[in-house]
Amino acid sequence: MVGEVCDYCELDEKHVFYSKSPLDLSFVFQIQDKLRDRQELFFEKRVSQQSPDLDVMKPLIPQILEKDVLLSYPYESIRPFLNLLQEAARDPKVNAIRMTLYRLAKNSKVVEALVEAAENGKQVEVLVELKARFDEENNIEWSRTLEDAGCHVVYGVDGLKVHSKLCLITRKDGGRIQYITQI
């Protein structure tokens, strides 16, 4: 296969480096930051669409309890999910939020909502994947923030990499237990 790639790229195989470990491409983000004023070098930004299944001007929990909603990221906006987490953090009927986190942004609205939930007395359990390439430092810092707020933080399982983004919100309304799930 290496020969085929070399032929296609018109390279000699002596210019190929073999490595057992993945290449560290974190420098790419630094290049991106330095070239921000050269927008012609970047792909056109795609704007996420608002889901027609949700009215973001109304509380989301009742809408979701009424019918299932499918959101497809990044094509649809993540905003409804962030609003849902904020609603859950403030809803007196919500007693727990459990979530897996893979990549955390420098200004994570997800973590802000989880911290608010913990501060409001909700049981918050989070599995954080520390081996999220290029985001390890953010994940470590946010994990400390979550722990400081009283969240129970678990750091993955040896030999397995958690890449899924799951959320389970548990709510008790009267005698009924309700679950809202994000997969």
Show where each model-derived region lies.
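N-terminal localization/anchoring segments of enzymes in phospholipid and broader phosphate metabolism
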Residues: 1-183
